Amino acid sequence: MNDHTSPTSSSSKTDNAQQPTKSVKSQLYQALDDVPIADVRRFRRRLKNANSADALAAIGADVEAARSGVAKRDAHIPAIEYPEHLPVSARRQDIMDLVRDHQVVVIAGETGSGKTTQIPKMLLDMGRGRRGLIGHTQPRRLAARTVAERIADELGQEIGESVGYAIRFDDRVSDTTAVKLMTDGILLAEMQRDRFLNAYDTIIIDEAHERSLNIDFLLGYLKRLLPKRPDLKVIVTSATIDPDAFARHFADAEGNPAPVIEVSGRTYPVEIRYRPLVEPVEMKDGSVKEIDTDMIDGVVDACKELMREGDGDILCFFSSERDIRDCMEAIEKQHWRGVEVVPLFGRLSNAEQHRVFAPHSGRRIVLSTNIAETSLTVPGIHYVVDTGLARISRYSTRTKVQRLPIEEISQASANQRSGRSGRTADGVAIRLYSEENFSARPEFTDPEILRTNLASVVLQMISLRLGDISEFPFIQPPDRKAVRDGLMLLHELGAITDKERGGAPVLTAVGRDIARIPVDPKMARMLVEANRLGVLDDVTVIVASMTIQDVRERPLEYQAQADQAHARFKDATSDFLSSLKLWDYIGDSRDELS
């Protein structure tokens, strides 16, 4: 009798032992269709190297936990209803069909059509937002928070349940969140650690017509990413300002542009009245000379004229917070009965910002920056007063300084503003400039990429290893001199070397640190150096103060008192040290109160 087992018999036993393992592995691979997209690659890598029953059991437990997270998110999504009065609701099925059949869809509609609040709900209805988030970008923090609150309210939930938001210094996203509102800057920062955007199954780029630097970079990045993420859907929403440009940008390999769907619905006629800020004055010699009049007086006179037209709220556009405060004071001096004056700009507190959306009696006059032009829909507006001005960021290649001058807006922006009065009924818009002046204005506002310093976007591109900058698919390529200026600044900051790799410079260790900090490269360089010198806490306060508007209030009627109150924080040698004194005072006061 032979005690030795034959090789054939041994091999057969090994194969039999491996059969259950192969079966379990196959089942686990199939189960990956139900786990978050961001986890799939990690699970595949673990499964590839797992050969024992114990290893597969551990992976199986983790896969089941991941599937439970997806199921939890799905179970939390309520039944979805759509306001039938919104134009976008009438095109619901058309939009859902296009999203199902195409990787990119462009949706064009005027402010108030409902596209910003209803499209995320349609995507939830389609089953998206389960294995990955529906990322929804906004150009402004106020809009991101307000839109998230509105969608959550329509779903009957609190913020942070199925709908959350992430803006600088405030993150309200939980493990049940399916729709994530955020500024486009937040999404750009996330690319540093999630280059394939695996946290998302859908990206909505809202207000794309604004053509900010971040939006243009995101559109180029997504064009490169889509072939590598065939499961990712991209929705580009825009006002009816050249939506075909976005469709052409996302043309497929055969050159077919992405589909465009119009959802503006009905708009009402708007009567445009021109009231230039000049007053004819008869001179001693009998001639008539036009004298410039005060803008605030012009706004007050326009409001008086519109109040004689009938009921309805008035929306007035200004270029700055200071002008808004001055106008509030001027209107309050009129002592109009039953008139509420409400400001609207980005630096207001949450409670003050919500006032503009709260129900009210009587007439309301809303004094706003251009945030109400497209980002937010102010309800009840029948009349508009347009000063024709806005702060527009511009970079001087000669002085190497980024400025924020007050300029005349474009024809497209003026039409956007006047259109706010024709959403629910016939409207009237008063422009505080002449028709000749309007006709002489540029048709569109220059995209930000043509009027800003490009150091930050160039740094992002180098960090993400996107190759030759001149080959990047920008919707509109930047000026070569602006790119050179950006590279020169990064070189001066010590962020890049003289060497090149793949047609692009190479980051230094300092450059890699700067790229991870979501502020202007010059300020990020300050933080890196402060950390090296051991003064990071103080310099962080100074940098933070440089990235926002002055926190000190100087109301027109209390300027002397304000200056007296602020005097204790003044440092004769440096405004930066004044900011630090103010911060220390706030910290000490908080400690005392607590």
At which residue positions do the language-model features occur?
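C-terminal helicase lobe and adjacent C-terminal extensions/tails of nucleic-acid helicase motors
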Residues: 304, 329, 456, 491-497, ...
